[in-house]
Amino acid sequence: MSEILELEAESRTEFGTGAARALRRAGRVPAIIYGAGKTPVSISLEEKEITKYYRKPAFISQLINLTIDKKKYKVLPKAVELHPVTDIVRHVDFVFLEEKTQKMEVPVVYEGKERALGVKRGGYFNIVKRRVTLLCDVNNIPRNITIDVTNMPMATSLKSSKIELPKGCSFVTKKEFVLATIIGRRGAKTEAEGEQQAAEAGK
């Protein structure tokens, strides 16, 4: 589960390009919170702080307690606009979390893909899904889904039905899908082919 990040923001009442530029000159970033049937709230954040957190892994799935004028709101980042040269955060969209569950796009980490059995036999680890869409309990949103693929053999597919998700999470789609495959390069042998050749050599 993601740790809850604590951030402070200030409400803002001036809008438009000129107001946004003035905020950025003052070292602050314009942002907005919307969703859950609520009236959108325009805020500003401290630029260095939000940029620091954005550069950490999986910021877009980070659960945040956002304090605005002494009131706390549970939010999730939705979209981040960056400066095209410096990669400093220029604007952030957040969504309010009021429901018990939230649809999330979460990164997939394939642990041990370089050491997978099929790769050792000359295969190529092909990533089909780098992110998956989950329905998660808002208090149990994972930063990522980590899958150990070290025992994955040649010519096989890793399917969603075989993935154990964190408690409180499920795939949005009920239809089975493929996350990754190990495909053979020319000259690579599957386990069965290797055993057959070894048996023939021993005759």
UniProtKB/Swiss-Prot annotation:
Give this protein's Gene Ontology molecular function annotations. Answer: 5S rRNA binding; structural constituent of ribosome
The UniProt keyword set, sorted, is: Ribonucleoprotein, Ribosomal protein, RNA-binding, rRNA-binding
Q: Does the keyword Hydrolase apply?
A: no
* UniProt GO BP: translation
On whether Glycoprotein is a keyword of this UniProt record, the answer is no
| InterPro entries linked to this entry | Rbsml_bL25/Gln-tRNA_synth_N (IPR020056), Ribosomal_bL25/Gln-tRNA_synth (IPR011035), Ribosomal_bL25_b-dom (IPR020057), Ribosomal_bL25_C (IPR037121), Ribosomal_bL25_long (IPR001021), Ribosomal_bL25_short (IPR020055), Ribosomal_L25_dom (IPR029751), Ribosomal_uL5_bac-type (IPR020930)
Give the highest taxon in the source lineage: Bacteria
| Entry GO CC | cytosolic large ribosomal subunit
Q: Indicate the quaternary assembly.
A: Part of the 50S ribosomal subunit; part of the 5S rRNA/L5/L18/L25 subcomplex. Contacts the 5S rRNA. Binds to the 5S rRNA independently of L5 and L18.
Q: What does this protein do?
A: This is one of the proteins that binds to the 5S RNA in the ribosome where it forms part of the central protuberance.
Annotated family: Belongs to the bacterial ribosomal protein bL25 family. CTC subfamily.
Q: Which HAMAP family match?
A: Ribosomal_bL25, Ribosomal_bL25_CTC
Entry's PANTHER family?
Answer: RIBOSOMAL PROTEIN L25/GLN-TRNA SYNTHETASE, ANTI-CODON-BINDING DOMAIN-CONTAINING PROTEIN (PTHR33284), RIBOSOMAL PROTEIN L25_GLN-TRNA SYNTHETASE, ANTI-CODON-BINDING DOMAIN-CONTAINING PROTEIN (PTHR33284:SF1)
Would you tell me the protein name for this molecule?
A: Large ribosomal subunit protein bL25
What is the scientific name of the source organism? Rickettsia africae (strain ESF-5)
Give the organism's phylogenetic lineage.
Bacteria, Pseudomonadati, Pseudomonadota, Alphaproteobacteria, Rickettsiales
Query: Gene encoding this polypeptide?
Result: rplY
